[in-house]
Every structure is written in structure tokens, then in C-alpha cells.
């Protein structure tokens, strides 16, 4: 809740202890590439972002006998209606925009959910009539879309869908006055074209066409840790980079990449979307 987030912030300040949301996707190669390109103004002034957590997790409803998310996650969908997991998509784009660390931050939000149909259908199709999932009327809409406006007038679309039959995506789109960067799959469109790949911004540079951009704009931290990350793994290495970086910051006494304010800042979208 919003009240509990303030308790976390107050406790961190009073005890002078770090509190970092371990949002691993901020350390993916694509996300670090986009962060570096945004910092270098490759796509100009930032205007709009699109973030999401789109992941069909209906099969977790089958894992009720295991010690896993299937034991508790569906209960949130049963009672709550909004964006129940905003940070996985929002974390990276919020950092691209440097929100909460500059003069800009969230100003307002409006949120809409589709009807809640998919979970009820899945329960009927996969489980017996007297199964516990068939005794619940799921309230959470299959897809939630929230639009955030920042103090500087920039916009962010955040979506959440753990029910629909569609491919995984976090969208990861950031749009500026000189181009757009987007994920799933990684693609780039620049005013005047991507050198050696496209002639103008009317087509995306993808796949092998992005090699020159990786060579030029790969984040210094990724370059430094790439070999170790590939060896250690963890969601493609992002888990390792996140853990390595957190320990590195603590040992060297430098600020963490995500602080307590950002963790609560991103998380607040969940309850605010429900209120909206």
C-alpha cells in the first residue's frame, strides 16, 4: 500500500540503510543499451515511453500443490483490479527518463481494465467444477492499461496482462524528438536512418543491423561484465549484473543504481491504478 511504502522510506532514512528494489530487467543488455543512448541524446529529448509485463501465467493455477507463485498469485487477481505488477516494465523506461532523479516525476495517472474473463474460463476448462478456482469470481481485468503524465508533460503507457494467449513482452519503448528505441524484438528507428542499416525513420533496424549500434553504444558496465554475466547466467546474465553491481556499490560506498525512493515510486503505480 502507499502507507507501507512511506514506512519503508521512513525506515530507510531513520536507520540510514540502503533499500534497493532488485529489478533485474534494468540490467539487461537491451535496457542498458537504451539507457546509454538516451543519456547521450541519440534520440533527442524524450517524449513518451511504453512499458509492460505481458506474460501468460494461467498455468500457475495448475501448480496449487507446489511451493510457488500458483499458491498466492491468483488470489490477487481474484480481488484486485488494476496493474498488479508495474515495475518490471516501468523500471527501465523510468530510468531512461531519469524520473525522480531530476526535475521530472509522475504527476497523474488514469487506468482502465478490460473485463475479467480469461481466468474464469481457464478455471472452467482445466479444473473440476468443485475446484477452488471455480468457486472464485475473478475481479482483475485480463489486461490493464494505465497512462501516466509527468510534471514535464511526458507520457508513459504501462500495461499488465498475465492472462491472455500472447507472446511475452515488456514493450520497452522510448520515443524522442530524433528517434525511437523499442524492444521485443530489439529495434531502432532514427531520424535520417540508422547508419549502414536504414535510410530513414520509416523502417526499423533490427537483428544484425544493430551490431554497429551495440559496438558504439553498449553500456560501459555491460562491456565490463559481459563475459562474467554470460558465464554466470540468470535471465541472460541480467541477474548476475544486478547482484554484482549492488555489491560493488556497497563496497565502494557509492549510491545504488536504484534507491528506496525509486522502488516505491515505481511500485505506487499498482495501488494508484486500482484507485483510478
Where would I find each of the regions flagged by the language model?
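Glycine-rich phosphate/pyrophosphate-binding beta-alpha loops
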Residues: 140, 158-169
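C-terminal helical cap and adjacent loop that interface with cofactors, partners, or active-site loops
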Residues: 165-276
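Rossmann-fold NAD(P)-binding glycine/threonine-rich loop
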Residues: 1-18
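Short catalytic-loop micro-motif centered on adjacent basic/acidic residues
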Residues: 19-23, 157-160, 259
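Non-transmembrane alpha-helical segments in soluble domains
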Residues: 9, 35, 90, 94, ...
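Predominantly a Rossmann-like dinucleotide-binding segment in NAD(P)-dependent oxidoreductases
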Residues: 13-20, 25-137, 246
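Short, mixed charged/polar active-site loops
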Residues: 155-157, 180
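Active-site beta-strand termini and strand-to-loop segments that position acidic
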Residues: 146-152, 176
Amino acid at each position: 500500500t502507499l502507507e507501507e511504502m512511506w514506512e519503508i522510506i521512513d525506515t530507510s532514512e531513520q536507520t540510514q540503510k540502503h533499500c534497493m528494489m532488485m529489478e533485474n530487467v534494468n540490467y539487461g543488455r537491451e535496457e542498458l543499451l537504451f539507457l546509454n543512448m538516451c543519456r547521450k541524446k541519440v534520440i533527442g529529448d524524450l517524449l513518451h515511453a511504453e512499458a509492460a509485463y505481458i506474460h501468460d501465467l494461467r498455468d500457475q493455477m495448475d501448480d496449487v500443490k507446489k511451493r510457488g507463485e500458483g499458491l498466492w498469485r491468483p488470489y490477487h487477481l481474484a480481488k484486485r483490479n488494476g496493474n498488479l505488477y508495474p515495475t518490471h516494465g516501468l523500471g527501465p523506461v523510468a530510468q531512461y527518463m531519469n524520473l525522480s532523479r531530476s526535475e521530472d516525476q509522475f504527476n497523474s495517472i488514469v487506468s482502465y481494465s478490460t473485463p475479467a474473463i480469461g481466468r474464469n474460463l481457464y478455471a472452467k476448462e482445466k479444473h473440476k467444477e468443485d475446484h477452488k478456482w471455480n468457486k472464485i469470481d475473478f475481479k482483475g481485468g485480463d489486461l490493464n492499461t494505465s497512462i501516466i503524465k509527468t510534471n514535464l508533460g511526458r507520457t508513459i503507457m504501462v500495461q499488465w496482462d498475465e492472462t491472455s494467449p500472447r507472446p511475452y513482452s515488456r514493450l520497452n519503448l522510448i520515443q524522442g524528438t530524433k528517434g525511437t528505441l523499442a524492444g521485443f524484438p530489439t529495434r531502432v528507428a532514427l531520424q535520417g536512418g540508422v547508419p549502414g542499416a536504414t535510410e530513414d525513420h520509416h523502417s526499423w533496424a533490427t537483428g544484425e543491423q544493430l551490431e554497429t549500434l551495440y559496438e558504439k553504444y553498449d553500456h560501459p558496465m555491460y562491456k565490463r561484465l559481459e563475459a562474467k554475466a554470460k558465464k554466470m547466467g540468470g535471465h541472460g546474465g541480467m541477474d548476475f549484473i544486478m547482484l554484482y553491481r549492488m555489491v560493488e556499490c556497497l563496497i565502494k560506498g557509492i549510491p545504488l543504481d536504484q534507491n528506496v525512493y525509486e522502488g516505491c515510486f515505481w511500485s505506487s503505480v499498482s495501488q494508484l491504478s486500482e484507485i483510478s
